[in-house]
Every structure is written in C-alpha cells, then in structure tokens.
C-alpha cells in the first residue's frame, strides 16, 4: 500500500483536476469509515491467531494464557476461530452493502452537486467502490490469518505484487481517460488477486488436512470470548477515525472541493510517511504477542526501543525532505494540486508524530489483550468533531481548523498517557 500510494499519486495529481482529487480523497475516507464496521475484530482475530500458534488452549476475555516455548497448536481451537471469522465477516459485508447503497449513495449525490467534472465517471466509480468495500470486508480475515501465523514476509510479498498490479492498471487506465473509474476498478482487481494468493499461502495441504481431522470448538463460544476486547478496539478505532479522518467528511460541507483536495493530498502523503515509520512495529506484532504469552519483558523492552527509534527517525527524515522538496516535486510533474503551506505542513507533521507514538504504545498494551484506551479514544474523537464544527463554522478558520482540531483533542490526554503507561510497565519508571 505504501509503494502504490507514492507511485500513483503523481499521476493522479498530473492528470486530474483539483475537484476530482477532492472526490478521490472523499472515496478514501469512506473506505476508512467502512472498515470501522469491522468493530476491531481483525486485530483481535490476528492477535488470537498468534496466541493459538503460540500454544494456548483457551482464548480469554482479558489477559492471555501463558505457555512454554514449544507448546503444540490446538487445531480444534483454530478451526472454531476460522469458522467464527467467516460468519462474522459475511454478515458485516451484507451490512456494508446496505449502508453504502442507501445512506452512502445519498451522501455522494449531495457532494456531486458541487462537482463540475464527469458525473457519469464519478457514479461508475462509486458503484465500483461499493463492490470493492463489500468484497474487501468479506475477506478481511485473510490478513489476520497471515499476520497471526507469523507470515509477515509472505504477507508483504503478496501486498507488493497486488499493489504493483494496481499501480500498473491504474496508470494505464488514467492515461486512457477513465478518470476515477481507473483508480477504483484497479483497486478491485488488485484486492481479488491479493485475497486469492493469501488463501493459498495459509491454507496449505498440511493445514487443510490438520483442520479436516480436528474437531471444531463452538464458534459462538469463541466470539463470546473475544468480543469484549474486539468491541473495545472497534470503539478505539471509531475514535481514531473521528480524530484523523472526519475532517475530510465534515470539511467537505464547509470548504470548497479545491481546499479539500489540497488538505486531502497532504493527509495522503502524511499517511504514507506514517506507514513507513510504523513498518518495524507492524512487522513485530506477532513477536509482541509471543513475548506477552511467554512474559518476556526483556524482549518487549528491546522491541519498544527499536520500534520507537525507527518511527521517530523516519518521521524526522521524511518530514524534512517533504517540507523542502514537496511542492518542488509537484511542480516537476505539473501537478494541478499542491500541498498545504509550510507552516501548516510542519504543524501536521508534529501532530502526526505524537499521534503515532501514542498509537504504537497502545499497541504494546494491546498485545497483552488489554484495551484500557477505548473510552479516551472515543472522548478524543467526540472532542475533535466539536472542535471541527467550532473552528469551521463560527470561527471560520478554514484549513487551519482541520489541522488543529484533532491535534488539540489528542494532546489533552492520549499523546502522553499511553507512552507513559508502557514505559512504567516495562522499566518501572
């Protein structure tokens, strides 16, 4: 996903007018909103799959069963968990379809009234967006299986191949004049290919035979065990969405599509930079779960220092390059849209660094199957929405309001709380 965004963005900015870029950013935000209907089950499933392959025999509501390093895998528990995942995501896909066809289409029709571009292309892209979101959610657990099993390298290879296909198709179709349809259609094809490959990697002949021979634990019991923390994660993600993504949806009602486009592409590149900064952390997630099951505090300290140090280094290096070279690079490709001014960009970088530092610390807590941060996350999200309305409507702060609202909401508590909790837990300070 990181590489695809970096490679494709210049072509989008070069060939598409600002209004179309604004619609594309709205699409990206709607996709992020749809994924909230996962309710936190994907990271919870991934973490519990890691526990199962570490040898646990039961899944607990809070905490984790400690094991030795050579405990056998309980395939009966794994089989029941797989069945629970399939049932859950099947129902979620049906719900997403209903919401997008009704409320989603009504919202998009309202936005199109301000759009002077090709509305037929935009509506076709919207139909494809509905299809990709439903299919993506229906097969969402495939990523959890690979990450939980520890197939980090294979998962990355599949993503690289899928995104290479996505970029190649999208660029060709954009230059063939297909507009938004090119991007969304290419995403759909890429997602199907990635899911097929993920299935083949996890469900080997050996895995199929072991699962076939195993009894199955009741999926309802498994869902009851993991649902409390999954819902807490889901509420945390909902708060995170309100903090990080609601500005696009709310801002589009108060600002022009051109302003939304400038803010949106800046946010897109910020997301790319943040994902690069979090690569080490994402790669070590299965190891964090294993350290928790084995109560290995020394290992957790080592991973925390490595992940935090790499994240800060990438943010600083990438941020400096972006500030000095960002708009120059856009001029080089004759982009019709530019990044926000330097002062705004620097503030966004600082806010983004604090955000991902506390999110990473929360991940270390979550590896122990504890979710103490869901209420603060919801409170931060609600505060962000209130501040957005205040800054955009009565105060009319424009894009500055989009930037400052989430930063102020997070700085009040979450930015400092969770790093301090992890440091105290691991070092006793």
Model-derived segments and spans:
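Transmembrane helix-bundle signature of multi-pass secondary active exporters and lipid flippases
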Residues: 27-39, 236, 240, 244, ...
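Interhelical loop/hinge segments that connect adjacent transmembrane helices in multipass membrane
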Residues: 180, 184-187, 196-244, 295-298, ...
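Membrane-interface junctions at transmembrane-helix termini in multi-pass inner-membrane proteins
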Residues: 133-159, 181, 346-377
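Interfacial transmembrane-helix starts/ends
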Residues: 25, 61-91, 223, 227, ...
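Membrane-interface helix-loop junctions in multi-pass transport and translocation proteins
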Residues: 13-20, 153, 164-196, 326, ...
